[in-house]
Amino acid sequence: MPEKTIVVLPGDHVGTEITAEAIKVLKAIEEVKPEIKFNFQHHLIGGAAIDATGVPLPDDALEASKKADAVLLGAVGGPKWGTGAVRPEQGLLKIRKELNLYANLRPCNFASESLLDLSPIKAEVVKGTDFVVVRELVGGIYFGERKEDDGSGVASDTETYSVPEVQRITRMAAFMALQHNPPLPIWSLDKANVLASSRLWRKVVTETIEKEFPQLTVQHQLIDSAAMILIKYPTQLNGIVITSNMFGDIISDEASVIPGSLGLLPSASLASLPDSNKAFGLYEPCHGSAPDLPANKVNPIATILSAAMMLKLSLDLYEEGVAVETAVKQVLDAGIRTGDLKGTNSTTEVGDAVAEAVKKILA
């Protein structure tokens, strides 16, 4: 089996700690499966890159990422770098655009049923919640034409979507739905009662599913209505949820409170359909860099589960990815948890426990 090259971009603050724990788990796989070899290449991104090079994404980091099988990212940003002309988050936007990472996948479920009581929503309401937000990541208002206030007292941002952009994200959602038997339902979220871009979105999603995936069902929901359903009846959205860049950013962050901690939720950003389990992708936790958190207190589970997604979708190591997810469930069920989950364990203790569990599962 050829060596798998993983570019590691720790980023800022807790980013270094959480990527270290994910690497620990990946090395545990190497230990019990000698035929599997990972080549980890570390590079700078975000505030750490600004401090060292003056730019949030150095050329060497971008070039290495383009040549890798996958990218594992920690977290970027922090108050130290403020909101000036050069910001850590620009590194993230640039790498997404340069690597054409057009689809962001964010699962929302419970890594373990033992966590149900930690949700801020009643356990009986959230039990069984299981959906994936498929967010369009390189179009829409975040990448549209913008005009800063130049002293005139007026600023603007432009939301633009084209037919091909909506078609390819719809195909990604359809592919994800078809990985299940029976296929999962698709929910498309927009603001078609107000926005022209949303009316195009709704039309193209409908046409693409009807013409290319007649075996699938798609239901359209206005984003504000969906935001209410997500809290009141989250299981109604079970399946695949597809939406635009900004709406996906907001709704996936809202969904992240359901399992009780951002420290549990992974994400994948893909440049193509994972139809061969070898799609190029960037994997990162849904949480930020947590600059106020003391050392060894951050929950590494989201990053470890991001590595599990990487194994399944980019590295053609599906069995090993499932083993990591199973190990996480075992560790959480055993009560080994960080403070955000009402536990007393450190970052490294949780990582150690998952690594040991993975070894036992794969041995």
UniProtKB/Swiss-Prot annotation:
Subcellular localization, as worded in the UniProt entry: Cytoplasm
Residues that coordinate or bind Mg(2+): D224, D249, D253
GO biological process terms held by the UniProt record: L-leucine biosynthetic process
Alphabetical list of PROSITE patterns matching this protein: IDH_IMDH (PS00470)
UniProt-listed Enzyme Commission number(s): 1.1.1.85
Domain of life per record: Eukaryota
Pathway: Amino-acid biosynthesis; L-leucine biosynthesis; L-leucine from 3-methyl-2-oxobutanoate: step 3/4
Keywords in alphabetical order: Amino-acid biosynthesis, Branched-chain amino acid biosynthesis, Cytoplasm, Leucine biosynthesis, Magnesium, Manganese, Metal-binding, NAD, Oxidoreductase
Binding site for substrate: R96, R106, R135, D224
Catalysis performed (reactions): (2R,3S)-3-isopropylmalate + NAD(+) = 4-methyl-2-oxopentanoate + CO2 + NADH
Cofactors, names only: Mg(2+); Mn(2+)
Residue numbers binding NAD(+): 78-89, 288-299
Residues under site feature: Important for catalysis: Y142, K191
GO cellular component, one term: cytosol
Family matches, as SMART domains: Iso_dh
Cofactor binding description: Binds 1 Mg(2+) or Mn(2+) ion per subunit.
Principal location: cytoplasm
GO function term, MF aspect, one: magnesium ion binding
Annotated function: Catalyzes the oxidation of 3-carboxy-2-hydroxy-4-methylpentanoate (3-isopropylmalate) to 3-carboxy-4-methyl-2-oxopentanoate. The product decarboxylates to 4-methyl-2 oxopentanoate.
Quaternary structure (record): Homodimer.
Record-stated family: Belongs to the isocitrate and isopropylmalate dehydrogenases family.
Protein name, entry field: 3-isopropylmalate dehydrogenase
